[in-house]
Amino acid sequence: MYGKSSTRAVLLLGIQLTAIWPIAAVEIYTSRVLEAVNGTDARLKCTFSSFAPVGDALTVTWNFRPLDGGPEQFVFYYHIDPFQPMSGRFKDRVSWDGNPERYDASIFLWKLQFDDNGTYTCQVKNPPDVDGVIGEIRLSVVHTVRFSEIHFLALAIGSACALMIIIVIVVVLFQHYRKKRWAERAHKVVEIKSKEEERLNQEKKVSVYLEDTD
């Protein structure tokens, strides 16, 4: 009887640990795809979430897989302090731009070259959270950045706003011009009436004078 109870307790504990363990995995978030111009700098953004509080045990590892194949290359390592590569293509070309307290493990890559094309991996371990999917960013170094759908949308919105502003300005100017024309016409009408009244008065005076002389 005691043996069966112990077995059930162990099984129950195993089920509970299995249910808890996936929650404890570190989750990585990246832009997945990044396009940058040759010779410029790029921020490789990598953020994460962890079940455990961030502490001094946290480590961040960045590696690189070339587009044309070949062995994986070391890019950057962080553990309390940043550690830059002492040799290789990324020497003096990479810097830490993250903040573990804000769950940010990003880096900056300087002076991009065409042979930097490839996949950059971001791995974060925050014991006891050491499992999880490694984040990836596929970097494409190009001569010029192509317009994306967001750029076209921003351009369309900007053009529409500019058109609306122009229409409003035209309407305001037209209304102002129209009021000015009406004011000028009203002034001319008043002036004509005034002259006509003055002429009639003069004629009346002449008529009265002639009658008196007769």
Curated annotation (Swiss-Prot):
Principal location class: membrane
Protein name as annotated: Myelin protein zero-like protein 2
Its job: Mediates homophilic cell-cell adhesion.
Gene name, Swiss-Prot/TrEMBL: MPZL2
Keyword entries, A-Z: Cell adhesion, Disulfide bond, Glycoprotein, Immunoglobulin domain, Membrane, Signal, Transmembrane, Transmembrane helix
Pfam families: V-set
Residue intervals on the Cytoplasmic side: 173-214
SUPFAM superfamilies linked to this entry: Immunoglobulin (SSF48726)
Bilayer topology: Single-pass type I membrane protein
Family to which this protein belongs: Belongs to the myelin P0 protein family.
Source organism: Pongo abelii
GO BP field: cell-cell adhesion
